[in-house]
From Swiss-Prot:
Mg(2+) binds at residues 67, 106, 138. It comes from Erythrobacter litoralis (strain HTCC2594). The keyword rRNA processing does not apply. InterPro entries: Pantoate_hydroxy_MeTrfase, Pyrv/PenolPyrv_kinase-like_dom, Pyrv_kinase-like_dom_sf. One of its GO terms (cellular component) is cytoplasm. Binds 1 Mg(2+) ion per subunit. Disulfide bonds: none annotated. Homodecamer; pentamer of dimers. One of its GO terms (molecular function) is 3-methyl-2-oxobutanoate hydroxymethyltransferase activity. Catalyzes the reversible reaction in which hydroxymethyl group from 5,10-methylenetetrahydrofolate is transferred onto alpha-ketoisovalerate to form ketopantoate. This is 3-methyl-2-oxobutanoate hydroxymethyltransferase. It catalyses: 3-methyl-2-oxobutanoate + (6R)-5,10-methylene-5,6,7,8-tetrahydrofolate + H2O = 2-dehydropantoate + (6S)-5,6,7,8-tetrahydrofolate. Keywords: Cytoplasm, Magnesium, Metal-binding, Pantothenate biosynthesis, Transferase.
Length: 289
């Protein structure tokens, strides 16, 4: 049983763009922030498959192949078990399904923390295997040397500060960060260190809003918020959360749909028709002429 994927650029409800657009580039994303401001916020969503990328692409500036796929796709308890091979394969699918957005792929836990050289080997593997344009890694000041090392060797890097899911065991959970002066100062310092190291954009996740605003104002690179502030230079959500695939979602998620209910209702109707032998009907069958 198989379905052939083909990039469909026809105008339809599922494919609203009449013709392919030229793909954005990392420098163009970086240049969206001028004089400390981004006139139109950047839009980023996660994508893990070619078809998902095709549906999201025309509406986004960036598609993030997030290590959140560990939980969303594979049912893992956290992002910790995600492998480079998983990330490379899903990123390749997203690149094939898109033509406009900058595709960024997460570097999974354990693939970059040991040294800049390890990070280069992992990042170059991801980009060569997938065709993605950039990588994203978690960590602030401690990762600045690695970000600079990658940048100097032709690998664009998106940073990630604040609540960093790969460090959940150290942080002790997914609570918002920046609730005391030390945490708040560290978030801003981390963002500035990544900015100075050459990160082309910085995700700020799960921090108190005033801290997100302060970090955004402190850096030249665009910031992309998730549970941060509307004053960030862009926003990102996990697509499945935004679509309503899961009943329980973080506080910072707004559900723009209830696709889970639609899927369940559709599957129920299909099952009922199969059991009643009303599917397949005459219009789905081949008859001799």
């Amino acid at each position: 049983m198989s379905t052939t994927f083909k990039l469909d650029t026809s105008t339809s409800r599922a494919n609203p763009t009449p013709a392919p657009m030229k793909r954005l580039t990392v420098p163009k994303i970086r240049a969206r922030k001028k004089d400390g401001k981004t006139e139109e916020p950047l839009v980023m969503l996660t994508a893990y498959t070619a078809r998902q990328a095709q549906l999201l692409d025309a509406h986004c500036d960036l598609l993030l192949v997030g290590d959140s796929l560990g939980q969303v796709i594979y049912g893992l308890p956290s992002t910790i078990p995600v492998t480079l091979r998983m990330m490379a394969d899903h990123a390749a699918a997203v690149v094939r399904g898109s033509y406009h957005s900058v595709v960024v792929v997460d570097m999974p836990f354990g693939s970059y923390e040991q040294s800049p050289q390890q990070a280069f080997e992992s990042a170059s593997f991801l980009l060569k295997e997938s065709g993605a344009a950039a990588v994203k890694l978690e960590g602030g000041e401690a990762m600045a040397e690695t970000v600079a090392f990658l940048n100097q060797r032709g690998i664009p890097v998106m940073g990630h500060v604040g609540l960093t899911p790969q460090a959940v065991n150290v942080l002790g959970g997914y609570a918002a960060r920046g609730r005391n002066d030390a945490e708040a100062d560290k978030i801003v310092t981390d963002a500035k260190a990544l900015d100075d190291a050459g990160a082309f954009a910085i995700v700020i996740e799960g921090v108190l809003e005033p801290i997100a605003v302060a970090a955004t104002e402190a850096v030249r690179a665009p910031t992309i918020g998730i549970g941060a502030s509307a004053q960030c230079d862009g926003q990102v959500l996990v697509t499945e959360d935004m679509l309503g695939m899961f009943e329980r979602v973080p506080r910072f998620v707004k559900k723009y749909g209830d696709i889970a209910e639609t899927i369940e209702a559709t599957a129920k109707t299909y099952a009922e028709e199969v059991r009643a032998r009303s599917f397949p009907g005459p219009e789905q069958l081949y008859q001799p002429k």
